Amino acid sequence: LREHPEDAVQRQWDIMNHNATAARKLVQRVGSLPPERRMVRLGSEMLQGYTEANWIKWWQQPEIQRHCENIFAPVGEMARRLDVKVSFHPGQFCVLSSVTEDIRKRSIEEFEYHADMARWMGFGKSFQDGCKINVHISGKLGPQGILDALPKLSPEARNLITIENDEMGWGLDASLELEKHLALVMDIHHHWIRDEEYIEANDDRVKRVIDSWRGQRPSMHYSYSR
């Protein structure tokens, strides 16, 4: 960036335009699948360096923000037209329940980056309106850490956040402590690994997870071991 700033900026323009176009094509492809399979996870690397110190000011320029809205809006429009649920999953370093204040602050910034993309697509105006931003509880503060973070998030981020049970850390029972505050995502494989239990469809906990979506179509994950 310091040695070739013009080349770096042009590369950013090229990458953001390419990734937005690719996302629209991906949503279009998923929209051709059977209704129960119409969910797509978009990558966190769509906009390079969005929360990185050297690039934050560049990304926050009004003209850049307007351009992002223009290129992401068609992605959301197509998702709604084809009834495709959009999903983001911030990486492992997004730890809203960390005991370290600086990590919590940077985690909120990272979460809001995903909320910005969802907002440009037209999502986040109401609770779980077609896009989710999914994280694990992760940090040592546990469910209470998530509750403490919620008021610090933008309205769109609060509408779209989901919490998924982890296979090593905070499990399904911890997630259920948040069922009245946000939507929950149950990963069957994570639960099987952590709790050594295959959860049945008629289990009351499954109903509670579904009810946390407040009438919206819920999402469920079935991960696999690496």
Task: Say what each PLM segment does.
Residues R104-L184, H189:
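Eukaryote-skewed repeat-based solenoidal scaffolds used as protein-protein interaction platforms
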Residues S44-Q48, P90-C94, I137-L141, N165-G169, ...:
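Active-site-proximal loop/turn and secondary-structure-junction residues that shape catalytic pockets
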Residues L1-K85, C94-I108, D116, M121-F127, ...:
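Alpha/beta catalytic barrel-like cores
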